[in-house]
Amino acid sequence: MTATPQSARFSVSLIFLIYGTLIGSYLPYLPFVKDRFGIGESAFSMGFLFGAGGALLSLPLAPWIIKQVGTRKAVLVMSLCYLSMVGFMMAAPSFPIFLAVFLLVGLTISTWEIAVNSQASAIEDQMGRPVISSIHGFWSLGTFIGSAAMAGWLALELNGIWLIWGLIVLSFLALPKVYDGLMRREQIPAESTKESAPLKLKYMLYPPLIAVAFYMIAGYMLEGTFQAGGA
């Protein structure tokens, strides 16, 4: 069955909602994980480097992976890996194991982000109007839902890990719907062609692109500081 831009928009919005909800739920729970390990804020914050390191390590491989399997399968496989790894990470019995799993979580991020945003870009092109911002808005909505759910859960003095695991189970159940609605390779011009456009240095040195790159670096530095400080 061929997906429509509308069904693809729903699927991409849903996966952004899933990721946002899960992140919004496990970030408030991280201080409990830190206390379980019996370590200080400085050591635990350094642990976030493993997640960032995993994302950086996988970034050069992400385009090759997507070229081999397509964005649709990449979203599915990376989502399955991410959900599984987050579940293990929250239940890690020791800090070294937590770091190792956090590295694996990071390894899934780059490919997932490129794949899902490629789907969003193709949807916007086919719908002929700007929709990426509204799709990304579901990530923010998810973080609000996840953090509010964890706040209420902890207020009832319940173990937060059960909420996280419950959300992971619900996310697994939603993945078939996400996968079914995503656009197929033949529907996305950049994926359906077998010819690869040559990478030219002048495009990489395009001033507006460099400005956006530095803006993204600053944004992710701020996000990393916020997450580490919150934990």
What are these regions (language model features)?
Residues M46-W64:
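Central cavity-lining transmembrane alpha-helices of secondary-active solute carriers
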Residues M85, P96-V105:
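Paired small-residue
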Residues I97, S134-E186:
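Helix-loop-helix hairpin linking two adjacent transmembrane segments in secondary transporters
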